[in-house]
Amino acid sequence: MSNCKTIAVCNQKGGVGKTTTTVNLGVGLAMQGKKVLLIDADPQGDLTTCLGWRDTDSLSVTLTEKLRAIISEQEQNPFDGILHHKEKVDLVPSNLSLSSLEMTLVTAMSRESVLKNYLSLVKDKYDYVLIDCMPSLGMITFNALTAANSVIIPVQAQYLPAKGMTQLLGTIAKVRKHTNADLKIDGILLTLVDGRTNLAKSTVEALRENFGSHIRIYRSMIPAAVKAAEVSSKGTSIYAYEPNSPVSKAYASFTKEVLADGRQKERLHAAHEHAR
């Protein structure tokens, strides 16, 4: 499966639905028959707890151990400690130990590529790798962007995101310049959209005004819902918890948009190979 696509779900602002999006996109892709690996790249471990592993401190193997082994060039079984969720996604979990690794990375050789080097050992087994980034633009997030083919940016509809987005786009530009020239922005996903669609419209307009039409905004928008907040305590996706809810339908629609991107990429790749 060398056609594996790695997507970083990224926004340095917290509370925009990054983890919820990673879970529901991941499970949505798995429901469509794709093999999916989720990476919790946040020391808070929200993705890990969202999927039902509450006591993150008791996990003996997390992303920290995987990356430490790469840094120290120790032999490792790269699949050891990968957790298997009942909704058919795999997870490299995280806990607070990841924040201490951030300091180690600063002095490591090829420090921006440690996560990329780890993923090269496992990604042939998967169609998609989704990285849930922490809400900051430090070295771990830089690693995620270096390892990724593309970025999905969840943005809260009630929040005019001009300033934060400028920072994030600046970081993406830096990554492109130094460590990952091919990094693409797949699009912006509007989340927590309430019934007042005018507010969502004004956010879309502000995004277009500030960032031009070159950044795509997904047609699917994720509605705000109390139920969606409840799901994170259940250890399941929205599909398992409330399959007919507006949030579930919105994430299913978003998953189809992401799959359509993947199919287009495959067609372009095939055409390129044929032309050679």
Language-model region placement:
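P-loop NTP-binding core
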Residues: 1-276
